[in-house]
């Protein structure tokens, strides 16, 4: 696939690795004959390591077929995470090192997960934008402290720690943004 045909979300092969395109910048310099250049911000699949590369419009990058299968987290098998396909109930097993820091967002029965599959092999997961987690440990609210909006640390049921507003108490369910790792509101 030529560089000028690539769109955000495409998966390509580059330098022996597989990458998903997340951002594209197009530039047409005036000084050297008007050759259009494309700068791709791409992340490795699996792993999510960011790479920045520039290409001419005619450069060829082989496209890779990536399937996104909607799944539910089923259980943990030792250090591996097992996800169940929502349509055909195919189990997908991914090692903890592939899941990485996203493990702190995964709870029993979590839905809305997309398992990314290349050649029938699961290679990565894409989590929902927000997940609901329970606060298991946080300091109590200070009396009269509602005039200022001071965040305080809170330990969640997955072992993750985030900063929450002072009014959040132990046992409350909160929404956490999986992209930033920040408090996103109270859960219903």
From Swiss-Prot:
**Which stretch is the leader sequence?**
none
Q: Which InterPro entries match?
A: Elong-fact-P_C (IPR015365), NA-bd_OB-fold (IPR012340), Rib_uL2_dom2 (IPR014722), Transl_elong_fac_P/YeiP (IPR020599), Transl_elong_KOW-like (IPR013185), Transl_elong_p-like_YeiP (IPR011897), Transl_elong_P/YeiP_cen (IPR001059), Transl_elong_P/YeiP_CS (IPR013852)
Which residues are listed as membrane-spanning? none
Question: Which GO biological-process labels does this protein carry?
Answer: peptide biosynthetic process
Q: Per the record, GO CC terms?
A: cytoplasm
Pfam families attached to this UniProt entry: EFP (PF01132), EFP_N (PF08207), Elong-fact-P_C (PF09285)
Q: Which GO terms describe its molecular function?
A: translation elongation factor activity
> Of which family is this protein a member?
Belongs to the elongation factor P family.
- Its recorded name reads Elongation factor P-like protein
What organism does the record attribute this protein to?
Xanthomonas euvesicatoria pv. vesicatoria (strain 85-10)
């Amino acid at each position: 696939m030529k560089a000028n045909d690539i769109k955000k979300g495409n998966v390509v092969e580059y330098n022996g690795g597989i990458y998903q395109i997340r951002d594209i910048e197009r530039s047409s310099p005036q000084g050297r004959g008007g050759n259009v250049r494309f700068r791709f911000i791409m992340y490795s699949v699996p792993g999510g390591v960011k790479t920045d590369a520039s290409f001419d419009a005619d450069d060829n990058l082989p496209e890779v077929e990536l399937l996104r299968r909607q799944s539910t987290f089923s259980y943990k098998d030792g250090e591996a995470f097992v996800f169940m396909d929502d349509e055909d109930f195919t189990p997908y097993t991914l090692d903890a090192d592939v899941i990485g820091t996203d493990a702190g967002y995964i709870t029993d029965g979590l839905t809305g997960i997309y398992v990314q599959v290349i050649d029938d092999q699961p290679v990565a997961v894409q989590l929902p934008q927000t997940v609901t987690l329970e606060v298991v440990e946080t300091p109590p609210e200070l009396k009269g402290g509602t005039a200022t909006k001071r965040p305080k640390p809170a330990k969640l049921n997955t072992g993750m720690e985030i900063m929450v507003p002072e009014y959040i108490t132990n046992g409350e369910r909160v929404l956490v943004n999986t992209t930033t790792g920040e408090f996103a509101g109270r859960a219903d």
